[in-house]
Design a protein with these regions (language model features):
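Ribonuclease/tRNase effector modules and their secretory precursors
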Residues: 1-93
Length: 93
């Protein structure tokens, strides 16, 4: 999968860095999301866990080209969102 990142105009680095999330962590979540659902407008929201155990929310837009996405931002899940994710995961058969 090809992953492009929104670059922060101030730093020239991926916007995810502002939230303490690097490219490898985003790739790990997108490769095996626990949830992937529609977001606002054309975006999608992937929730998942990195190999290091961090739970992240990744906001992205699928590119017209198959197998390619544009990541807008990503950040760690807060305690309330993490509890909700775990509750939803328990309910699934």
């Amino acid at each position: 999968m090809e992953i492009r990142f929104y670059l922060d105009p101030e730093t020239g680095q991926p916007h995810t860095y502002r939230h303490g999330v690097n490219e490898v962590e985003v790739e790990q979540v997108l490769a095996r999301p626990l949830e992937d659902r529609p977001g606002r407008e054309w975006s999608r929201v992937a929730l998942g866990q990195t190999r290091a155990g961090r739970h992240l929310r990744v906001i992205y837009v699928p590119d017209p080209e198959p197998g390619s996405v544009f990541v807008i931002t990503a950040y760690p899940l807060g305690p309330k969102a993490l509890r909700a994710l775990r509750r939803r995961r328990r309910r699934k058969p």
